Amino acid sequence: MAAPVVTMQNLIEAGAHFGHQTHRWNPRMKPYIFGARNGIHILDLSQTVPLFARALDFIASTAASGGKVLFVGTKRQAQGPIADAARASGQHFVNHRWLGGMLTNWKTISNSIKRLKTLEEQLSGDTSGLTKKEVLNKTRERDKLEMSLGGIRDMGGIPDVMFVIDANKEELAIKEANVLGIPVVAILDSNVSPDGIAFPVPANDDAARAIRLYCDAVAQAATRGGQQARADRGEDLGAAVEPVAEPALVEEAAAPVTEDEQVPAEAAAETERQSDA
């Protein structure tokens, strides 16, 4: 089963080679840094391409064996792409604040998910027996639970692999995955440590276009793996009532920048970092 291919050209067009300012680097990323330009580290994409290919192969094979993929990215510019990619591939996601114990205390989390589903049933049914205040309180509780747990409501247990955007911001999620022996695929910018990451992918983790590229590629790998799993079970994929749609091609996510969009990638990435701070 062929995983999607992300080329060096795709990565360059998305600005994936631009790291942080040199004074903000993490020395443990030195093996993945090509050099510096205008005070900004340049990541070595000749390593990124094969490392990402290896990670995508692992995700595809995990999904093909029936495994669950958890997408994690809570920073502002990652929230949309993370949710879109997980939904498109029939997988799971966390794109708001990571709750402590979300994996290591799964029993408590699963009880909260049950509460979410109960509230949804109550609010979608006849609420005439409730006061306006009771309806309002239940609605607020449901919305809060949906924001935190909606992306994992159907996961049914801990995932088999975790994909992370921004290893610094998602440090707690990675620690929980490490405790449970869950392999982590992570996009690593020049300011993070690769420790605890089974599948490191050195690349910019701030530029919105680059994040979309990574998420689409992982979604495509998970989709192909899931299709293989269903085929192995003898399911007729063509007869599915609502077949899982394969995400847009990776090449489309990294389409050339138009003249109207043309902004130096360094400036764009730095602007997004500052606004997310």
From Swiss-Prot:
InterPro entries: Ribosomal_uS2, Ribosomal_uS2_bac/mit/plastid, Ribosomal_uS2_CS, Ribosomal_uS2_flav_dom_sf. Gene3D superfamilies: Glucose-6-phosphate isomerase like protein, domain 1, Helix hairpin bin. GO terms for biological process: translation. Signal peptide: none annotated. It holds the Pfam family Ribosomal_S2. Residues 239-257 have a biased composition (Low complexity). The keyword Transit peptide does not apply. GO terms for molecular function: structural constituent of ribosome. One of its GO terms (cellular component) is cytosolic small ribosomal subunit. Keywords: Ribonucleoprotein, Ribosomal protein. The keyword Heme does not apply. Residues 226-277 are annotated as: Disordered. Transmembrane segments: none annotated. HAMAP family: Ribosomal_uS2_B. Belongs to the universal ribosomal protein uS2 family. This is Small ribosomal subunit protein uS2. It comes from Sphingopyxis alaskensis (strain DSM 13593 / LMG 18877 / RB2256) (Sphingomonas alaskensis). The gene is rpsB.
